[in-house]
Amino acid sequence: MNPNQKIITIGSVSLTIATICFLMQIAILVTTVTLHFKQYECDSPANNQVMPCEPIIIERNITEIVYLTNTTIEKEICPKLVEYRNWSKPQCKITGFAPFSKDNSIRLSAGGDIWVTREPYVSCDPGKCYQFALGQGTTLDNKHSNDTIHDRTPHRTLLMNELGVPFHLGTRQVCIAWSSSSCHDGKAWLHVCVTGYDKNATASFIYDGRLVDSIGSWSKNILRTQESECVCINGTCTVVMTDGSASERADTKILFIEEGKIVHISPLSGSAQHVEECSCYPRYPGVRCVCRDNWKGSNRPIVDINVKDYSIASSYVCSGLVGDTPRKNDRSSSSYCRNPNNEKGNHGVKGWAFDDGNDVWMGRTISEESRSGYETFKVIGGWSTPNSKLQINRQVIVDSDNRSGYSGIFSVEGKSCINRCFYVELIRGREQETRVWWTSNSIVVFCGTSGTYGTGSWPDGADINLMPI
């Protein structure tokens, strides 16, 4: 090869290499620009249009680092949309209940700073469960805990912690309240908080950490609400509120709330005579509540709420094994589905039940007269057959020698079904235990199971003689 040919060959090779390098630089530039703009866009599968990421509520923020030669590009993966809960899955089939959580608040109060509380409940967002209670504005080992048997003071606040975490000094005080309800609509928490004078109280509606709406007492006689979770379906949350006498006719209303704003109020209708402290659960497409009749019945009233047209129906649990306390013994008690049974109806305790086809699962104190012990069972035909009394799958949660208190339901959505869980308030201190001057509680929590289970008793467990006075 002569010198001219060598020069031509070397030049051709150099030109080829230069062309390849030029094309690679163009490819890198195009990729860089594309990824840079991609981090601000999401592809919407519904209509193939591009929409910005910023206004979308997100569950998590994931950043990937992509390396191209000497260039570092941060690419944000657009998160999935957070949607309202609709609770459309079926109810889980269960054989009974298994232990889930216990906070041991009273035992821990013997040596630590734990809030004095009552009226606890549990509610869950889509990822985690929380326990709530109405605090008395004091810890137990504190002279302010004297005489905390009283229900309504301006110092009471709604407390919120992860389930299983006792209410320590770092606990968040969500709002001022001596009566409350809370629920998560899939996007944010709604808290209904009642406080003020007995004859002119205020209910505040707090959504996503902001006060959105309020309503004043309509009967000027202790406006009050559920003391357990409310329920939200497709962005509409329902809460049952009562104002009026605790031992005669009262004025109950069902409030419909969207993102903290009251959008409709329906009066109670149907055959229920007195409704307080409802334990509510989603029963798609509506909401169902089992409540406390503090006037005429030891059988529990049912309130059915239609979220779409705001209509209300009410009746009573059919089971002749009734759920309130005090009550007649099981041989003598009765219920015929429509009306209160007029059996030891005056006074009562918050409780729960839920339908399982024609049957009913329910919990109640073991004692017929006092808030002692706690049991659960299923009554065959108890939802549809008047005065049905065939009991199966009985479990003791708290033995009859130990104190219980309020109880209520909460629902947990699984992959294929909705599970029902319940909590039991374990009251300690006054009035029964007069060695001390305070009244407070711990809780125990069980959830439905399709498996097998054993036996036991899960009382509060604190030795009152070791407790601060």
Swiss-Prot record:
Checking Pfam families in the record gives: Neur
Identify the keywords attached in UniProt to this record, alphabetized. Calcium, Disulfide bond, Glycoprotein, Glycosidase, Host cell membrane, Host membrane, Hydrolase, Membrane, Metal-binding, Signal-anchor, Transmembrane, Transmembrane helix, Virion
Q: Which organism is it from?
A: Influenza A virus (strain A/Texas/1/1977 H3N2)
InterPro entries, per database record: Glyco_hydro_34 (IPR001860), Sialidase_Influenza_A/B (IPR033654), Sialidase_sf (IPR036278)
CC terms in the record's Gene Ontology section:
host cell plasma membrane; membrane; virion membrane
Subunit arrangement?
Homotetramer.
Q: Which residues bind substrate?
A: R118, R152, E276, E277, R292, R371
Quickly give the catalysed reaction: Hydrolysis of alpha-(2->3)-, alpha-(2->6)-, alpha-(2->8)- glycosidic linkages of terminal sialic acid residues in oligosaccharides, glycoproteins, glycolipids, colominic acid and synthetic substrates
Q: What else is known?
A: The influenza A genome consist of 8 RNA segments. Genetic variation of hemagglutinin and/or neuraminidase genes results in the emergence of new influenza strains. The mechanism of variation can be the result of point mutations or the result of genetic reassortment between segments of two different strains.
Biological-process GO terms, alphabetical: carbohydrate metabolic process; viral budding from plasma membrane
> What gene name is listed for this protein?
NA
Q: Which residues lie on this side of the membrane: Intravirion?
A: 1-9
Its cofactor is: Ca(2+)
Presence of the UniProt keyword Glycoprotein in the record: yes
Its recorded name reads: Neuraminidase
